Amino acid sequence: MLFTGDQCYEEEEWLLETGAQVVSDILKIGHHGGNRSTSARFLDAVRPKVAVTTTPAWVATMPMPAEVTAMLQARRIPYFRSWEYGTLTICSDGKRFRIVLK
């Protein structure tokens, strides 16, 4: 799982330029799924099987930017927002993973 925290476009570009291995099955979308995070280039480099957004209550009423959801949908990457599903638990045996919604 790749945790991006409050990472925005500039940090994504820096990370890619360093040659860091960013491929991950699960991507925690940067900056709570807000503007200026998760560029197409970064998403293509990570190649996640699923994306997760942790969204505090004060942001919950704002939709994730259309461009982010469009990129995820175009790549057929399922995404989960904590405010929609509540607690998101990711279970793994080191080879496979599953997301438990509560």
Predicted regions and their residues:
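Active-site-proximal loop/helix segments of hydrolase catalytic cores
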Residues: M1-M64
